[in-house]
Amino acid sequence: MKSIKIKCPAKLNLTLEVVNKREDGFHNINSIMQLISLYDYLAISVYKAEKTSIELSGNSNEIPYNEKNLVYKAAELFLKKTGLKNFNIKINIEKNIPIAAGLAGGSTDGAGTILGLNLLFDNILSEIKMHELCAMLGSDLNVCLKGGCLHATSRGENVRKLPVKIYPVTLIKPKNLGISAKEAYTKYAMKKDKPKYYMTERMIEALKQDKDIKEFLYNDLEYAVFDDYKELQQIKSKLPKSIMSGSGSTYFILEDVKNIDFSDDYQIIKNIRFITDGCSEV
């Protein structure tokens, strides 16, 4: 039996600009994504067995522990692509990243699974191959695997490193509101007026020159869903400098906010920072 523990960081979209809809139903985006110090943890164990099996467990009752979970899909794909057989893989998921929040909680766990299994099997896959598997599983996995600050294009799976400028972060999420990517992109497509601010390019230049990036925070999907949810309007009214991450419903502000006057209907996560790495062994 071999075991490993992997920490899987959440991500923020510092910018998210929708370019167009693709023939495969996904959207091409232009986005800057930043990993932050909010982590899920995976405890992965591998046993020799008469037949191959994958078992999931965890601390959250909000996620499935079966083949519908991206962790399961990642383990299954890893075994298929490596040709490994007759192993029992057990993965315990310690969930700390909010669900359906625009923070890539599922994607980072999937990326962490690929990394952890590859380490347990003596780096059977190259870094390039790991990224290929991550791209097959979803749009945000490569960001979570590579880590730091990244310029993401295509549907989000094509990434290149950018300089990291460290900021404190406060997260605010309506507890009872999750917005699916499908809903957000559909509503964006229905908008007749789609302003173009080219914030991604402007933020890239600011990062390269080590300048403040706060004025360039932007999300097309916030524009798409904001008018439909009073919970989002409440956040923005109290924290005008905050911005939505991904398809929501989490908002973030690049400050250590000491006193936040929100009801118990909101989850507040403080003492978070930008980080320079991605999924990694604990």
Q: Each PLM stretch: what is its role?
A:
Residues 1-101, 118-131, 153, 164, ...:
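ATP-binding N-lobe of GHMP and related small-molecule kinases
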Residues 14, 42-44, 71, 106, ...:
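Residue-level signal for inorganic ion chemistry
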Residues 16, 40-44, 140-144, 150, ...:
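Short beta-strand scaffold segments in enzyme catalytic cores
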Residues 17, 27, 71, 102-108, ...:
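Gly/Ser/Thr-rich beta-alpha loop segments that engage phosphate groups in nucleotides
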Residues 50-64, 113, 208-218:
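Short, basic/glycine-rich phosphate-binding loops at helix/coil junctions
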Residues 92-121, 139, 241-253:
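Glycine/serine-rich anion-binding loops at beta->alpha junctions
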Residues 112, 118-162:
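RNase III-family endoribonuclease catalytic core
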Residues 146, 150-241, 254-282:
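Conserved, helical-rich catalytic subdomain that frames metal- and/or nucleotide-binding sites
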